[in-house]
């Protein structure tokens, strides 16, 4: 849902954890099914206001799923906070996931956070919560894969539950059976897009986790200049954002700073966060050897 110039917009992170079911692992293999369950559970709070709460991205950590939620409108956010405070959101998520996994019980634990901290302890102070959520404007577009799932589900007649269940089952069986290299690059290949570097022609493709990890391991103190070069064509990588990354991950070292830089680039640009753009930024800063290493990586991350 596109926000108008005067529309109230904000975002928040919703952390979901279960001690009985490994949610990150399940999500990897049942992405469409779990995404639809979470989307359905969260939309219960909108009371008919379609697209007023949107899941922009789902991150996986070791033990939990982290949903990046966008609110379009003050009232939907107020209703969500009210339902969350009364544990209705948690119960909806629990029930939907329980049905997904066909288990009798599925206790879950949730937590709301913004960039500067958690919100659960402030739920009695609604105005303060709304202020913090409003201040955290969404900085990324919807994840390409989630948008693709949305489009597929829209094409199904929602008044036919059997058709929806059949489609979700098919999607998940395909996700489980595809080889990792095929699954991870499904629909991402840029047909016919090539570029030249040091006299050789290369096929462009979106950045993978292997590219990000190799960059973070190799770039060292030059991560900031590369970030500024990328920032010329990526609004999310402005000087303030780069300095915030430097400060926030200072204790974690340059690897983590560089890693988070490319994660932000990829999250904000989606499919447009390509190898070519990173290679150009590296070349601009005289880091041709790193660029060549990245170009030599296979899809499995090996040279």
Curated annotation (Swiss-Prot):
- The transmembrane segments are none
Q: Name one GO molecular function term.
A: transmembrane receptor protein tyrosine kinase adaptor activity
- Keywords of this protein's UniProt record, alphabetized? Apoptosis, Cytoplasm, Cytoskeleton, Nucleus
Q: Which InterPro entries match?
A: DEATH-like_dom_sf, Death_dom, TRADD, TRADD_N, TRADD_N_sf
The protein's matches in CDD domains, at most eight in alphabetical order, are given as: Death_TRADD
Identify the Gene3D superfamilies for this entry.
Death Domain, Fas (1.10.533.10), TRADD, N-terminal domain (3.30.70.680)
Q: Where is this motif: Nuclear export signal?
A: 141-157
**GO BP annotations listed:** extrinsic apoptotic signaling pathway; positive regulation of canonical NF-kappaB signal transduction
Q: Does the keyword Nucleus apply?
A: yes
Cross-referenced PROSITE patterns: DEATH_DOMAIN
Give the chief site where it resides: nucleus
For the keyword Nuclease, the answer is no
Q: What is this protein's function?
A: Adapter molecule for tnfrsf1a that specifically associates with the cytoplasmic domain of activated tnfrsf1a mediating its interaction with fadd.
Protein name, per record? Tumor necrosis factor receptor type 1-associated DEATH domain protein
Organism this protein belongs to: Xenopus laevis (African clawed frog)
């Amino acid at each position: 849902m596109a926000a108008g110039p005067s529309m109230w917009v904000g975002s928040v992170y919703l952390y979901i954890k279960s001690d009985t079911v490994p949610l990150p692992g399940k999500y990897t293999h049942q992405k469409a099914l779990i995404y639809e369950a979470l989307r359905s559970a969260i939309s219960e709070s909108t009371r008919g206001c379609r697209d007023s709460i949107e899941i922009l991205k789902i991150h996986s950590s070791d033990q939990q799923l982290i949903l990046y939620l966008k609110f379009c409108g003050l009232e939907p956010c107020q209703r969500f906070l009210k339902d969350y405070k009364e544990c209705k959101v948690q119960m909806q998520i629990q029930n939907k996931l329980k049905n997904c996994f066909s288990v009798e019980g599925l206790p879950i634990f949730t937590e709301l956070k913004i960039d500067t901290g958690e919100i659960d302890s402030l739920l009695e102070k609604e105005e303060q919560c709304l202020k913090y959520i409003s201040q955290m404007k969404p900085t990324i577009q919807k994840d390409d894969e989630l948008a693709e799932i949305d489009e597929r589900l829209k094409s199904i007649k929602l008044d036919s539950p059997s058709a929806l269940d059949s489609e979700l089952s098919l999607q998940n069986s395909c996700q489980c059976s595809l080889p990792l290299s095929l699954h991870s690059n499904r629909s991402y290949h840029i047909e016919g897009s090539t570029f030249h570097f040091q006299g050789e022609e290369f096929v462009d493709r979106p950045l993978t986790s292997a590219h990000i990890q190799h960059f973070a391991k190799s770039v060292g103190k030059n991560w900031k200049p590369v970030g500024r070069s990328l920032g010329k064509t990526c609004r999310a990588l402005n000087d303030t954002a780069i300095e915030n990354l430097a400060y926030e991950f200072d204790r974690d070292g340059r690897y983590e700073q560089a890693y988070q830089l490319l994660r932000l680039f990829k999250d904000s640009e989606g499919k447009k966060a390509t190898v070519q753009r990173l290679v150009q930024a590296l070349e601009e800063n005289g880091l041709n050897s790193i660029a060549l290493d990245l170009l030599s990586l296979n899809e499995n991350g090996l040279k």
